[in-house]
Swiss-Prot record:
Protein name (database record): Peroxisome assembly protein 26
Gene it is expressed from: Pex26
Family assignment from sequence similarity: Belongs to the peroxin-26 family.
Phylogenetic placement of the source organism: Eukaryota, Metazoa, Chordata, Craniata, Vertebrata
GO-annotated molecular function: ATPase binding; protein-containing complex binding; protein-membrane adaptor activity
Primary role: Peroxisomal docking factor that anchors PEX1 and PEX6 to peroxisome membranes. PEX26 is therefore required for the formation of the PEX1-PEX6 AAA ATPase complex, a complex that mediates the extraction of the PEX5 receptor from peroxisomal membrane.
One Pfam family per UniProt: Pex26
Localization in the cell: Peroxisome membrane
Residue ranges that the UniProt entry lists as topological domain Cytoplasmic: 1-246
Keyword Ubl conjugation listed: no
Transmembrane segments: 247-267
Keywords: Membrane, Peroxisome, Protein transport, Signal-anchor, Transmembrane, Transmembrane helix, Transport
UniProt organism field: Mus musculus
Keyword Translocase: no
């Protein structure tokens, strides 16, 4: 994660330009202690790469600014201190603390300087957590005092492309692109096209998830049908085995012989009649087969000998 934070901080440094002691960024009175602390913090960040010391120096500068009267110079110093502090936190892989650290001094999101808010949006969107700064950016854009600032349009576009679209807030992105005067006609068309593509992609992903969830259900249904069919076949096999064993049992054969004798007695069948010879011959052969099958099961070794 350290490498990710380092790479995330590298492009962010170009937003306001590197702060070096040899190149004073602001024309500030030499008597202001916050100026010296700002220069010291920028040296620690850029030259010495001592990020922890740079962050502590920024915090000391903020404490000294509490006694300074509010002026345009102080506003610029506060903004520069926030930039240095955010970059130091990102380099230490503590980028998640950047927004809360800034709000500790500005109290409310609407009072954030545009450059500081832009830096936070780029940082959190690059680290794949746009939702962390989404509410802060929305509150800043809805404030009437901020809508007349020169940087309002660029922040509105960043809000759409870097925060709302990755977070899936397509309706809010569309409403902002259509109603906001910060978008030119070309920028509005570009934003609406991006929203349309994101909506199509979201629909495709939802359809794919639905089909993926239906697939296990189909497999379960097919498995249940196969299990029922297998159970039915096993039941039929057991029934068939029971019928066969019943037919081959000794009591059944005795009952069949008794029924045959009873039938002969009832029909008064004459065994001495010439017409009965074929029937008697077939009956004798049947009895011999039954006897042979019975004896072969009882005395298999004797029959082989």
């Amino acid at each position: 994660m350290k490498s990710d934070a380092s790479t995330s901080a590298a492009p962010l440094k170009g937003l306001v330009g590197p702060l070096r002691s040899s190149e004073p960024a602001l024309a500030l009175p030499a008597v202001s202690p916050a100026v010296h602390l700002l220069e010291e913090a920028s040296d620690l960040l850029v030259v010495h790469l001592d990020f922890h010391a740079a962050l502590e120096t920024c915090e000391r500068a903020w404490q000294s600014l509490a006694e300074e009267p509010v002026s345009g110079t102080i506003v610029e110093v506060k903004c520069s201190l926030c930039v240095v502090g955010i970059q130091a936190l990102a380099e230490m892989d503590r980028w998640r603390e950047a927004l809360s650290w800034v709000l500790r001094y500005y109290q409310v999101p609407e009072k954030l300087p545009p450059k500081v808010l832009e830096l936070c949006i780029l940082l959190y969107s690059k680290m794949k957590e746009p939702g962390a700064v989404l509410d802060v950016a929305s509150a800043w854009l809805q404030d009437p005092d901020n809508q007349g600032l020169p940087d309002y349009g660029s922040l509105a576009r960043l809000h759409v492309f870097r925060l709302l679209l990755p977070s899936g807030r397509l309706s809010e992105a569309e409403e902002l692109a259509v109603r906001s005067a910060a978008f030119s006609e070309e920028q509005r068309v570009e934003a609406l096209q991006a929203i349309h593509l994101a909506r199509q992609q979201h629909t495709q992903e939802h359809t794919q998830e639905h089909s993926d969830s239906q697939e296990p259900q189909k497999l379960r249904q097919e498995g249940s049908f196969s299990q029922k069919l297998l159970s039915l076949l096993m039941l039929l096999r057991r029934l068939w085995g029971s019928v066969v064993s019943h037919l081959l049992s000794q009591p059944f054969r005795k009952g069949l012989l008794a029924a045959l004798i009873l039938c002969l007695l009832i029909l008064r069948f004459d065994p001495a009649a010439p017409s009965s010879l074929p029937f008697l011959y077939q009956l004798t052969q049947l009895f011999r087969r039954i006897q042979k099958a019975t004896l072969s099961r009882l005395y298999p070794l004797a029959l082989r000998d």
